[in-house]
Amino acid sequence: MQFLSQALKIAPVSFLAYGVNVAQAEVLNQESLAKQVLHETFGYQQFRPGQETIIETVLEGRDCLVVMPTGGGKSLCYQVPALVLNGLTVVVSPLISLMKDQVDQLLANGVAAACLNSTQTREQQQEVMAGCRTGQIRLLYIAPERLMLDNFLDHLAHWNPVLLAVDEAHCISQWGHDFRPEYAALGQLRQRFPELPFMALTATADDTTRLDIVRLLGLNDPYIQVSSFDRPNIRYMLMEKFKPLDQLLRYVQEQRGKSGIIYCNSRAKVEDTAARLQNRGFSAAAYHAGLENHIRADVQEKFQRDDLQIVVATVAFGMGINKPNVRFVVHFDIPRNIESYYQETGRAGRDGLPAEAMLFYD
């Protein structure tokens, strides 16, 4: 099992301390163990507002709906319980890039995590499945369409999962800003796993969307946490268009090499804007759904590594982006709705340091 063993070599400490050593979990109550996991595995001294109550509620076996701003610490709300509970936590995620980022971060923190996706070889997928069966893997990231395959659900039933976390849960609702039909089938899981605690997480969901998530996922009397959407470290600004390209170039020049994202509403405008930035000597690249997968993956990887300063993108550059040091987000066009605007500007300043969101308007 070379593929899996390489991952687990990176992650021996927390896996042994919180996955196998059941005696320790019996000595410490779950709340104390959760705080220990937070500190020793993830390196935080204390929970952010709302996190501790959510985690305690999940550990009690109750369903939860978590609406927390981008960069607010949603992932820890299921990652900490996953290491306290004795079993497998399944995380539903819509994007391969998002799964990979999460798994890489967990492995770096010493947590035995893996994902199943279409980019893996059959052998790699079998090794991950074996790791779930033997209890080696604590968190499994998977796309909704793969999770809902009958043969996979049969396997999952034998693995005795302890928690199901549905990330980007607004995708299940037609009232949400990013409806995905494959999410709709997740409601069938409640009948299959009636006792399994469910956690739904999203950064943006109005009252109607929240009700839809609860109904469609079959959440039972869920604890609902809606956190403040204030991002005090982000400075929101408006700029009226006169000579928009010149204004944009001047603004980017003022950023002095800082990392940023520029959103445009069309692929043609993305390509044109990226080319003009490149011609002026900026480290910039285009990103949209019309590009081949390997090109998009290369752009994202370079951006994550700080080998690329600016990504000019359509909304396709979205949920999979988890880069802490984005210092500015520009909307060169008016975004399609306020939810999209909030989520996209929320990619700035995830490290808590000052950042800017600039909106150009006519």
List where the protein language model places each region.
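Cationic, low-complexity basic patches in intrinsically disordered or flexible, solvent-exposed regions
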Residues: F3
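Helicase motor core with emphasis on the C-terminal RecA-like subdomain
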Residues: L28, S32, Q36-T41, Q45, ...
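Short, positively charged and aromatic/hydrophobic N-terminal segments
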Residues: K9, S14-Q24
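Conserved Rossmann-like nucleotide-cofactor binding loop
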Residues: S97
